[in-house]
Amino acid sequence: GISQAALRSSNGAVVSLGDIKNGDTCGGSSEWGASSSYGWAVDDTGSKAVGTAYVDRNRDGVCESPYLGEIVPFIWDAKRGMRELDTSNLPVADLPWIRAHAISGNGDVVLGTSNFQYAYAWVKEGKAINLTERYGAEPAYAVSFDGHRVALNLIDTNTYQGKGVALWDYARGLTPIGSLEWCKDVPYVSWFAGDLCESMTGDEIKAQVGSPPMEIFDMSDDGSILVGRSGSFFTGFVGALWIERIGWMTWDDFFRKQGVVEASNIPFSNPISISGTGTEVVGGMVGASFSWLVNMNQVFVCE
């Protein structure tokens, strides 16, 4: 059989989200079988969902041909059902697939990507906005409740050097907020030269390679707290935390400032989710199959 995206509520009820125009006759294939749609995210009320769907454009019985616009982003609600997000302004013939993977709490702003190369946004189901072409953004996942803050990791698309993180507001534009710093927060380990922080300053490294790469996974509802990580599998990862009016710090530094000395010695390098209130964070260590819950109801950040 062919599966499809569904919503499961806390009382156990399951609602099928359906498919787009193919009557569940075909879908994307995997070792678990075929699926006509995959869900990625829901808004805060569970009334809207977004994800990936499959459409048989050329009616050959196959719904996953690349570069034909058969693998598409969808949005769903109970009243209108599943429908494609607008990709009419994108070069679909050059894109193997497009998906939607995040939605703001109020359902107004949807984020997605194609082939992990481009960052897209849809505002109130309008045309796709290519944030990579506009700002040099990598695929984005973190968005505030009202959709007016989207965390973007920026790169120079000509040199591929990091440019730090910025908050994008579809109504007001871009606000840079910096990043963690080489040597102070993030080691720079060269494949051939070892730890360059032993012979260079963080500013000297930044001048050559740009800012440390940042991945922002989530933010609080008001967008005042961001969680993510910096680094790579070559240099190792460090957990990252940004608090409005305070700035960036590593999680090791944060735990140390709270007096949680034992936690500061254990890498919290993969914080992946934060509650809407910003008081609870879930994450763990990159590559390890366990998670921690960090309760931040009482936080003191001082030097």
Can you annotate each of these PLM segments?
Residues 1-303:
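Conserved "turn/edge" positions that cap or connect secondary-structure elements
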